[in-house]
């Protein structure tokens, strides 16, 4: 007899890649999340963004966000995301350095945790347009659990910098053309 499922929690996950086949990497992130039995409710359009922080001369990122429902505990979701990153040979060597796959648990239901092992909501998500623009494409009215404001309102507070985000495609999960998502060493 299997254990009963826990309550369903809605979570937001950010996806990014700026090494290797970036499109394949972010697609693999979504596929891995779905294969783990997490119900992906919505996926944002795909954006190309300049790297923020970290070493100079990094290639641009592909960024997206997804909204999902899960009965897994938050720590289990985070562990899954780390395993998926490792499966794409993500190396955690340089802070804000280039990465094959970056998966961040942004929001997990109403949970607020500042533990070193599990910090949700993500402490800097509301400061980053490359996170908030894709999030607002799929969950503009979601309320930030710690700040008590909608994602739309948090995005409105951020300054717009010309060229910081380029919307590439809404159909990136199914589109077989790479277009502007070419590989980066």
Features from the language model and the residues they span:
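Short N-terminal secondary-structure initiator segments
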Residues: 1-11, 75-80, 84
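Flexible, gly/pro- and Lys/Arg-enriched active-site loops
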Residues: 37, 46, 52-61, 75-185
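Short basic (Lys/Arg) and small-residue
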Residues: 66
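N-terminal beta1-alpha1 ligand-phosphate binding loop
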Residues: 2-38, 44-50
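Helix N-cap motif at beta-to-alpha junctions
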Residues: 70-73
